[in-house]
Amino acid sequence: GKIKALVGAFPMELSVLGQTLKVFGIGTVSVHPYSRGCGYMKQLMNMALGDMKEQGFHLSCLGGKRQRYEHFGYTPCGQKLSFTLNNENIKYRLNHYVNENLIFKGVTDDIEQAYELYNKAQFKVTREKSVFLDWLRSWDFNVYFVYECNHFIGYVVVNKENTYISELVVKNDEDYIRVLATYIHNNKADFVNFELPVWEKQKIKQLTQVAEDVTLHHAYQFNVLNYEEIIAQLLHFKASYADLIDGVLSFEVLDYGMFVISVENGEVTVSKFEGECDVLLSHIEAMQLFFSPFGQHLVDDELFNHLIHSWFPAPLFMPTQDKV
């Protein structure tokens, strides 16, 4: 027979403080032009979602048009800060970070060091060592290893045009700024765009003072399949870099169920709940409240606002090289 439609479902693992969340990335969604309007995409998407739930996945993600995929439970959420650094920023504010001892090379035998450095992150997608380099080269990006006085200190993943750095992993925050400034200077780039997750507080503090532009965006489109596990792990992670106010709140998510979130002395528990809930939300509203930087307006109750604003948004993020 002939292929009329495709939906690719790609399993991966998100590691948060050593705990694993099972994620399904959706991609290659396509329908043959002669078969549009036959319902094949809807059928395949629903089949994929059914498989995810049956196999106990916690989360799914994809890219695409919002209204197209909200029918299937996906919505833009998560958070990322997008930065633009240009050569004027380097010249007048970061020139002292430019270092002639920093050398950028193509991939070398130090791939093992790069892999070990990547795995030190507390929030990361698990990447198998055997395909780590392929992962870095996804989207037809280039990979450069960074050396200082012949010592490996990190790596950079950048697009072909040298205008977007999707991944910059180095040994410490000071190296991050030096590598950024030197890379832009050496390549005589007019500008470079890059992104940071919200927990990179020291880097954000430095860069917001000098970057030409900084904007807060949704990280990707997500569909939460297990609220209890996702919220528990992400709030536990948030408690590692921010203070969470003690309290208890119960939620009902329509067509999902009820659960209660409790925070005490930085310890987070999320469990099933029975009874009258404090907050009632649709599935889309719930993801926006819990994970979007723009969702806190969905609950406007003086009894709960202090907890809502302390706990949420939880730090959901997806690096570019891990997107499908």
What is the meaning of each model-derived region?
Residues K2-M12, V23-S30, F145, H151-K160, ...:
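Conserved beta-strand in the GNAT
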Residues V31, G37-G50, C61, N172-I184:
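Conserved acetyl-CoA-binding loop-helix of GNAT-fold acetyltransferases
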Residues Q55, L59, G63, Q67-Y74:
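Hydrophobic or amphipathic alpha-helical targeting/insertion segments
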Residues Q67, T75-L94, T182-V324:
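Active-site/acyl-donor-binding loops of N-acyltransferases
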Residues P76, K80-K188, P197-K201, L225-I245, ...:
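Amide-forming acyltransferase catalytic core, primarily the GNAT-like/NAT-type
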